[in-house]
Amino acid sequence: RVSNLTIHPLRNIIDLRYVG
């Protein structure tokens, strides 16, 4: 989710938590 990083960096962190 590279595009998400640029739009919502916080959202990307949450996604990483879900994967982990």
Curated annotation (Swiss-Prot):
Compartments it resides in: Secreted, Extracellular space
Tissues where the protein occurs: Highly expressed in the placenta between day 60 and day 100 of gestation.
Record-level Gene Ontology MF annotations: aspartic-type endopeptidase activity
EC code(s) of this entry: 3.4.23.-
Gene Ontology biological process terms, A to Z: proteolysis
Record keyword ATP-binding present: no
Annotated keywords: Aspartyl protease, Glycoprotein, Hydrolase, Protease, Secreted
Record carries keyword Membrane: no
Enzyme class: hydrolase
Main location: secreted
UniProt-annotated glycosylation sites, renumbered to this chain: N4
UniProt GO cellular component terms: extracellular region
Family per record: Belongs to the peptidase A1 family.
Further remark: On the 2D-gel the determined pI of this protein is: 4.6, its MW determined on 1D-gel is: 55 kDa.
UniProt-recorded name of the protein: Pregnancy-associated glycoprotein 55h
Lineage per the UniProt record: Eukaryota, Metazoa, Chordata, Craniata, Vertebrata
